[in-house]
Each structure stands twice: as structure tokens, then as C-alpha cells.
């Protein structure tokens, strides 16, 4: 304003004074407009700058969050890698450490000294590591020995052959006594010899007698020997170990005897246990002069079986059930008291027994009222339980073939005739064969 007044000459007249006033007013208005424009430009620039700074702030915050997440991930990875490094170092140290010798404890002399037998054969009097509990060191225990001092480093768990573990049925048999027909007397004898000692041992203690150690079931094929053994295991809730006699016959010397020994050891460990040896005649045939190495190996396996049954060591709640259809060829040593204390014959069922078996197998069948089970039992003389089951199945197949909703008397008669023809034909005949 002062500059404007200095640049203007002094007014002489009123007109000049008015012109001067108007000029000054216009100049001031122009300056105010320029100032307002500059102000708006400055505000716009400031707003843009603030917006840019806010965007940058958000970007930096996002980068900080990402950096923190990366930091946490890296720390986690670091911990995992450190753990793997420690594990690898431990494995490396174990690989660099000398191997240990496998041995067996023979005798415990005192709290600090133990007699062991190494895998090479010699026996040594050694000491045990302080980390080994002295109460766990017992004769027969497997252990590891230091190569230099032969001191006991640690105890190993007992080892059983995988084939022996395969003999144990994980699931308890589902068969029960009601699934067995025509063997009422035999069931009672087996229950007295096997089930009663496991469930009520105090009865034998009261009377003062030892319970039977084993039961031998013999009779023609298909009469229910295996079924009876499964029913006993089901009723006693005992571990059931099933082995076929031929499985105990091995190729190499001593393998069969080792399997028998481990079978008894595992049975004692899992007591109460029922060992069922099916087709025991495969390993228990009468001993004769062995002409081949295979015959001698079978005899060695039989002797180990006899030793296990003799009870040199108490077997606890372990019962043995043997089954065979050739009792005439069994070794006499197997049949003496103290091994198989009860020898029970499982004969072919009579007419009453066949009727009982038919009732068991027809419980779930849909039959017409014309079916007379006593009549069918009379027509199946000489048939065993397996034959009667096959007859029931064949009768059902005839009903399905003829699209009938239920089995008729004629279906059973046709099934009886078919089963009879199946047994009369040779195995190579193609006519009259059974469905299954």
C-alpha cells in the first residue's frame, strides 16, 4: 500500500483524487485475488502432500506388519532347524559310537555283578551301568554289552518271531456253545478241563488237585473240533493262539523248536491264553528211526513241544487244545497223562445230534412249514457237521435258482442228493459239483 502511494503523484483536484482512489481500489482488489489464489494453491498442495504422506504411512505400516510376520516365520524356522541340527548331531554321535554286543543274562551274582553270555558264546562276569535298574536284571533277559568292558549298557525287550505273533488272533472268536450242535457231553468235558480252571481256580485248590494241562480232540474231519476250541476261547475271554501243526515244521535246524519255545513264552506273557494246535499229527507223529534230516528236525520240534507241555516251568493260565483226525499215528509220549490229560472223541453225530446241528444252521433260514428237520436228520445218516452245513447252503441255492421266497422240503431233498453225489464223484468230474 505504501509503495502504491509513493508511486502516485499528489492529487490536485477532486477528480484526480477520485481517479486515484479507484486506481488504488483496483490494485488492492488484484492483490487480494492473487493472495486468495496463492492461498488456494497452497491449500491444494498441502492436501496433496498430506494425502501422499498418509498413503506412505499406510504402506510403511503394511511393510512393518509383513516384516514382523517374516520375522516370526524366520524365528520359527530357526527353532525348527536348530532342533533338526541337534537331532542330526545326536544321530551323528550315535553313528560314530561303537556298536554294542548283544548278550543274555545267565545269573545275577549280587547287586553289582552279573554273569552274561555274549552272542559269540563265551560267558563273562561283568558289571552293569548305573542307568540300568538292578531289579530289572533277571536271568534270561536280553541286554547290550560294551565292547571293551562288556558292562551291561541297557536291557532289551524280549523278542518274538513275527510268525509267532501271527498265531495270535487279535479279535476274540465270535463262536459260542450255542453254535455247536450234537456235542453236549464233549462240551461239558472241555469246559471242565479248560474253562473251569481259568474262571474258578479256587475249586481245584479246595479239592487239592492240579487242573488238566491240555485237551486232545480227535475224530473225523468236519465234526466241529476247531469250532469247539473257538467257542471255549470266546466263553473264557482268553487270548486265542491258533497254529497248524505243519507251521511248526521249519526248514533249518532248530527253527521249529525255537518257534515252539517262543509260542509258549508269548502265551505265558499274555495269560490267560488258549493255545490251539490244529492237525497236531503233522508234528506229533510217532517217532521212528529218522532217515532224513527233515525227519530229524520234526522229531526235534516234537521234543520241544513235549518239553513245553511237561511243565518244567509253571505255565500259569495257559491251556493247550490239540486237534487231530489221526490219533492212531500220534506219538505215545503226547498221549500220556501230564500232557494231554483229557482225550475227547468228537464222533460223527447221531440222529439227535444231526437234528441239533440242523437247528443251528437253519436259525437264519427262511423255510416253509413243510420242512421237517427230524425227517432231514434221519435222511443224512453218516454226515458230519460240515456236510449238514453244506446241505443247508445247497437248499438255499436251489430256492434262489427257482426264484422261491422260502426253502421247501424238496430243496432239502435235492440238496441231500447233490451232496451225496459230490462225495461219490471223483475230484475231476465236472458234473454234480457243489456251488461252493
Swiss-Prot record:
Gene3D superfamilies in alphabetical order: 1.10.8.60, Nucleic acid-binding proteins, P-loop containing nucleotide triphosphate hydrolases
Location of region: Docks into pockets in the proteasome alpha-ring to cause gate opening: 434-436
Binding site for ATP: 222-227, 361
Subcellular location: Cytoplasm
UniProt superkingdom: Archaea
Record key words, sorted: ATP-binding, Chaperone, Coiled coil, Cytoplasm, Nucleotide-binding, Proteasome
InterPro entries membership: 26S_Proteasome_ATPase, AAA+_ATPase, AAA_lid_3, ATPase_AAA_core, ATPase_AAA_CS, NA-bd_OB-fold, Nucleotidase_PAN, P-loop_NTPase
PROSITE patterns in alphabetical order: AAA (PS00674)
Gene Ontology terms describing biological process: proteasomal protein catabolic process; protein unfolding
Record comment regarding domains: Consists of three main regions, an N-terminal coiled-coil domain that may assist in substrate recognition, an interdomain involved in PAN hexamerization, and a C-terminal ATPase domain of the AAA type.
Family: Belongs to the AAA ATPase family.
NCBIfam families, alphabetized: PRK03992.1 (NF003069), proteasome-activating nucleotidase (TIGR01242)
Record-linked HAMAP family: PAN
Functional description taken from the UniProt entry: ATPase which is responsible for recognizing, binding, unfolding and translocation of substrate proteins into the archaeal 20S proteasome core particle. Is essential for opening the gate of the 20S proteasome via an interaction with its C-terminus, thereby allowing substrate entry and access to the site of proteolysis. Thus, the C-termini of the proteasomal ATPase function like a 'key in a lock' to induce gate opening and therefore regulate proteolysis.
Name of the protein described by the UniProt record: Proteasome-activating nucleotidase
Originating organism: Methanoregula boonei (strain DSM 21154 / JCM 14090 / 6A8)
Encoding gene per record: pan
Amino acid at each position: 500500500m505504501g509503495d502504491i502511494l509513493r508511486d502516485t503523484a499528489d492529487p490536485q483536484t477532486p477528480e484526480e483524487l477520485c481517479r486515484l482512489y479507484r486506481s488504488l481500489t483496483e490494485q488492492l482488489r488484484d492483490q487480494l485475488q492473487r493472495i486468495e489464489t496463492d492461498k488456494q494453491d497452497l491449500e491444494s498442495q498441502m492436501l496433496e502432500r498430506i494425502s501422499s504422506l498418509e498413503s506412505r504411512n499406510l504402506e510403511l505400516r503394511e511393510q512393518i506388519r509383513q516384516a514382523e510376520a517374516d520375522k516370526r516365520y524366520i524365528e520359527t524356522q530357526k527353532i525348527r532347524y536348530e532342533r533338526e541340527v541337534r537331532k542330526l548331531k545326536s544321530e551323528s554321535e550315535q553313528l560314530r559310537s561303537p556298536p554294542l554286543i548283544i548278550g543274555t543274562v545267565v545269573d545275577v551274582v549280587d547287586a553289582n555283578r552279573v554273569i552274561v553270555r555274549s552272542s559269540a558264546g563265551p560267558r563273562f562276569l561283568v558289571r552293569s551301568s548305573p542307568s540300568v535298574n538292578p531289579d530289572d536284571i533277571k536271568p534270561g533277559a536280553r541286554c547290550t554289552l560294551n565292547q571293551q568292558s562288556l558292562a551291561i549298557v541297557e536291557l532289551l525287550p524280549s523278542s518274538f518271531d513275527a510268525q509267532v505273533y501271527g498265531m495270535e488272533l487279535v479279535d476274540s472268536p465270535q463262536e459260542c456253545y450255542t453254535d455247536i450242535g450234537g456235542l453236549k457231553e464233549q462240551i461239558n468235558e472241555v469246559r471242565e478241563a479248560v474253562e473251569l480252571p481259568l474262571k474258578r481256580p479256587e475249586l481245584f485248590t479246595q479239592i487239592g488237585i492240579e487242573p488238566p494241562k491240555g485237551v486232545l480232540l480227535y475224530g473225523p474231519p468236519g465234526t466241529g473240533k476247531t469250532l469247539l476250541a473257538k467257542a471255549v476261547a470266546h466263553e473264557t475271554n482268553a487270548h486265542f493262539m491258533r497254529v497248524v501243526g505243519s507251521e511248526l515244521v521249519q526248514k533249518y535246524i532248530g527253527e521249529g523248536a525255537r518257534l515252539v519255545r517262543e509260542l509258549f513264552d508269548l502265551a505265558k506273557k499274555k495269560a490267560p491264553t488258549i493255545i490251539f494246535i490244529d492237525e497236531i499229527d503233522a508234528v506229533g507223529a510217532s517217532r521212528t528211526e529218522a532217515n532224513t534230516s527233515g525227519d530229524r528236525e520234526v522229531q526235534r520240534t516234537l521234543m520241544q513241544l513235549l518239553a513245553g507241555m511237561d511243565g518244567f516251568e509253571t505255565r500259569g493260565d495257559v491251556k493247550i487244545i490239540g486237534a487231530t483226525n489221526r490219533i492212531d499215528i500220534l506219538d505215545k509220549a503226547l498221549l500220556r497223562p501230564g500232557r494231554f490229560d483229557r482225550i475227547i472223541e468228537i464222533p460223527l453225530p447221531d440222529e439227535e445230534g444231526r437234528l441239533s446241528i440242523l437247528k443251528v444252521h437253519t436259525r437264519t433260514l427262511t423255510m416253509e412249514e413243510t420242512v421237517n428237520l427230524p425227517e432231514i436228520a434221519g435222511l443224512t445218516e453218516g454226515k458230519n457237521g460240515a456236510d449238514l452245513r453244506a446241505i443247508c447252503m445247497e437248499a438255499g441255492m436251489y430256492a434262489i435258482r427257482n426264484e422261491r421266497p422260502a426253502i421247501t422240503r424238496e430243496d432239502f431233498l435235492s440238496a441231500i442228493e447233490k451232496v451225496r453225489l459230490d462225495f461219490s464223484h471223483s475230484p475231476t468230474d465236472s458234473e454234480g459239483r457243489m456251488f461252493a
